[in-house]
């Protein structure tokens, strides 16, 4: 009886903690909204019928049946972006002048303006991006090597901006400096971890980013293969050490903890290894990466969420960095690589958890906020074309339109890309072009439907 009471108490405490970490979702889900709008409930894929085209713009849905965002919602987003950019620029006057990172520093702001240039075509944003990246290139620390938290970010972003401005000499100089870090990355004797924020996967992203943004061959195949090989050998080594070679051939840890999520964990590493630009051979993907993903899949909570680490049994965090919003991306990539429906099905289950528990009290940011959670819906929409996920993304964007009105926690770096306002602006701008949206400093190409 005591054990039963303990379980009940734990259950109720869990529910209370969920409420403490997120706001109850006030929005009706897509089926109810579509039904209220006079459209067929559910997606066309689920019912096998094509939804009728409305003759007038429907005030209840933020997009047309063809997926194009309706003008009044576009206007609301554009107005909010302008407002938030003004607040952000004012706030950045007191930001840490030495933080050059993409995560919380100037490179993240450069990435935001690069994104706004991509969405609008306005050259002013590209030049603003250049202003910010120039600051970072003058202050490289030489201490960290990744895209998000190290020198690889400023150098890769600088190379792309200079390339877009047709300053090829400066662009190549950035690439050369980036590749000078290569020896440190591939050295197995180094203490370098493998995760995205501070490890090899974060450097790999920088190389793949250049080949995606500038063009194939910008970084040679050999350099990429050597980084991939170092990541794989490291994963095999820990797996042997932990005696998990058969169950999880590629095992990773950060600070002696086997994290699951996208930022510090296996989801982020597996996701990078499955990128087509990483050119990992099919045998390695099938024999090493796939069973490792399946091992992590089996750690899923009954709710559909995932633990922050393999040893953690508490269903608490629904963030991109820890939980379903990060794992969903590896499941979607696995579905594309291995063509097995189970991965898509579980990605959809992740989406349901994010819809229920993803409006976070931590704020509106990308790493552990509502914007980062909203990107999971955009990724699922691009792959499936199911309007349900576009609707969910739009509703999370609608929440962000009331930035600051919900009583969320104020982050340590309130104007930054991954913790603060810049991230929300990035997400809102991607809602304007959902077909080409991508999670910054993480997603590379665009998910395509088979």
Swiss-Prot record:
Oligomeric and partner information: Interacts with an array of inositol phospholipids such as phosphatidylinositol 3-phosphate (PI3P), phosphatidylinositol 4-phosphate (PI4P) and phosphatidylinositol 5-phosphate (PI5P). PIP-binding enhances membrane association.
CDD domains (alphabetical): euk_LANCL
PTMs per UniProt: Myristoylated. Essential for membrane association.
Stretches the record annotates as Interaction with inositol phospholipids: 2-14
Protein's UniProt name: LanC-like protein 2
Protein's GO biological process: carbohydrate metabolic process; negative regulation of DNA-templated transcription; peptide modification; positive regulation of abscisic acid-activated signaling pathway
InterPro entries: 6hp_glycosidase-like_sf, LANC-like, LanC-like_prot_euk
Subcellular location: Nucleus; Cytoplasm; Cell membrane
Organism (species): Mus musculus
Pfam families: LANC_like
Functional description taken from the UniProt entry: Necessary for abscisic acid (ABA) binding on the cell membrane and activation of the ABA signaling pathway in granulocytes.
Any Gene Ontology CC annotation: cortical actin cytoskeleton
Lipid-attached positions, N-myristoyl glycine: 2
Molecular-function annotations in GO: phosphatidylinositol-3-phosphate binding; phosphatidylinositol-4-phosphate binding; phosphatidylinositol-5-phosphate binding
Family classification: Belongs to the LanC-like protein family.
Gene name in the database record: Lancl2
Phosphotyrosine: modified positions: 198
Coiled-coil regions, chain positions: none
Keyword annotations of the record: Cell membrane, Cytoplasm, Lipoprotein, Membrane, Myristate, Nucleus, Phosphoprotein
């Amino acid at each position: 009886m005591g054990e039963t009471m303990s379980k009940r108490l734990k259950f109720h405490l869990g529910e209370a903690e969920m409420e403490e970490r997120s706001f109850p979702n006030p929005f009706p889900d897509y089926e109810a909204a579509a039904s209220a709008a006079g459209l067929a409930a559910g997606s066309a894929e689920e019912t096998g019928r094509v939804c009728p085209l409305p003759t007038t713009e429907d005030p209840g849905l933020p997009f047309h049946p063809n997926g194009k965002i309706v003008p009044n919602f576009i206007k609301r987003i554009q107005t909010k972006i302008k407002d938030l950019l003004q607040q952000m620029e004012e706030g950045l006057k007191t930001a840490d002048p030495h933080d050059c990172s993409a995560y919380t520093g100037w490179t993240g702001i450069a990435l935001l303006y690069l994104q706004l240039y991509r969405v609008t075509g306005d050259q002013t944003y590209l030049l603003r991006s250049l202003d910010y990246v120039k600051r970072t290139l003058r202050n490289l620390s030489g201490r960290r090597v990744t895209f998000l938290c190290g020198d690889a970010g400023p150098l890769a972003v600088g190379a792309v901006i200079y390339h877009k401005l047709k300053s090829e000499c400066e662009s190549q100089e950035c690439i050369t400096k980036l590749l000078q870090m290569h020896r440190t990355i591939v050295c197995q004797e180094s203490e370098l971890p493998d995760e995205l924020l501070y490890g090899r996967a974060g450097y790999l992203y920088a190389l793949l980013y250049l080949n995606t943004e500038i063009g194939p061959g910008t970084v040679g195949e050999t350099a990429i293969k050597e980084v991939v090989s170092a990541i794989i050998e490291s994963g095999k080594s820990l797996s042997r050490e932990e005696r998990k070679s058969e169950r999880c051939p590629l095992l990773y840890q950060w600070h002696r903890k086997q994290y699951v999520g996208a930022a510090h964990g296996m989801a982020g590493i597996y996701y990078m290894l499955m990128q087509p630009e990483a050119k990992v051979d099919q045998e390695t993907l099938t024999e090493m990466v796939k069973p490792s993903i399946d091992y992590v899949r089996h750690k899923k909570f009954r709710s559909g969420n995932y633990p922050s680490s393999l040893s953690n049994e508490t269903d608490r965090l629904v963030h991109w960095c820890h939980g379903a919003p990060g794992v969903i991306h590896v499941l979607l990539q696995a579905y594309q690589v291995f063509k097995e429906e189970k991965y898509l099905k579980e990605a959809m289950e992740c989406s349901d958890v994010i819809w229920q528990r993803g409006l976070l009290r931590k704020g509106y940011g990308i790493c552990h906020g509502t914007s980062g959670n909203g990107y999971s819906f955009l990724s699922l929409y691009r792959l499936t074309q199911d309007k349900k996920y576009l609707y969910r993304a739009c509703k999370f964007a609608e929440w962000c339109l009331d930035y600051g009105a919900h009583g969320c926690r104020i982050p340590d770096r309130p104007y930054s890309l991954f913790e603060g306002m810049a991230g929300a602006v990035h997400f809102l701008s991607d809602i304007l072009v959902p077909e080409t949206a991508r999670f910054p400093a993480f997603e590379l190409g665009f998910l395509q439907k088979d």
